Amino acid sequence: MLYLSQSDVIATGLTMSEIVDELEVAFREKGKGLVEMPPKPGIHPGNGDNFIHAMPAYIPALKSAGMKWVSGFPENEKRRLPYISGLLILNDPETGLPISVMDCIWITAMRTGAATAVSAKYLARNDSSSVGVLGCGVQGRSNVEALAVEFPLEKVIAYDINKDSARLYAKEITDRFGLDVKMVDNPKQAVTGSDIVVTAGPILRKPHATIKAGWMDEGAFASLVDFDSYWHPDALRESSKFCTDDTAQLRHYQEIGYFQNIPPVHADLGELVTGVKSGRQTREEKNMTANLGLALDDMAVAPLIYHRAVEQGIGTWLTP
């Protein structure tokens, strides 16, 4: 069994473009009903919005089976620890034997951004050139990286309650992607005027509902990476098409207290990719997606990392 640390995973050299492409394949399989993925069970240690989730999935077309064991602890930033952490176990779908254990911090960051890009391909205007980012952390970075694969991005409008985080973010995005980054002083400035809006703060059971109705432009698209945490219900109701990556799992979240004031779901991402449900149809419609982050995302990426690591001699082989 091959163990891959976070640095090993990164060293395989997998690109965001490859991840976006593989996720689209996986969601097409899901849209055909060819993916096995039960709603993720979880535990919630401590108080507030802490979670530890088990996320299993089997994608026959990609010969991928396994599970991610992932945690999210919002207070970890104060401890100078990652908000998201965990491990991924990849199994051989023919024998059931585990073939790899790998750190999942980088995988989670990259596949979440990639899912936004796949959603935006079907729900955003294809000439979208500006992105408003609220929350200049890991997901604020990976979502811009992924959107830059699919869209002719020119400008990022960045807001974060921590000004130092916003300044560091602006420099990094400019240096890495050559994009013009404007830091703004309030959330509305990052929403109004942006072709694409990404909210990427902590996931909260009770939304702080900062983004109000009327802020989002006609024709814009929003990716709610932090669920509905940032959004007032009236702002959500302005959506022409409110989508998600998995309707069944969204219903599960509603049962445990999340998403209490959202519009009816138009489609999940598999239905958009397969054409079962319509994506964007006019330049004027406002579209949104609340992608939950699925085991499918991780299990689409994990085999690519594993096979590349084996080919390149990366990682540590563990003996029984």
Regions found by a protein language model. Give the residues of each.
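Adenosine-phosphate binding glycine-rich loop
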Residues: 8-13, 229-320
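Glycine-rich Rossmann-fold phosphate-binding loop(s) that bind the pyrophosphate
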Residues: 135-137
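Short helix-loop-beta connector
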Residues: 123-130, 152, 217-218
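NAD(P)-binding Rossmann-fold cofactor-contacting core
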Residues: 149-176
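Short glycine-/small-residue-rich Rossmann-like dinucleotide-binding loops
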Residues: 201-203, 226-227, 247
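N-terminal ligand-binding/catalytic initiation module
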Residues: 1-109, 117, 127, 296-299, ...
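Short acidic low-complexity segments
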Residues: 177-194, 211
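Rossmann-fold NAD(P) dinucleotide-binding segment
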Residues: 193, 204-221
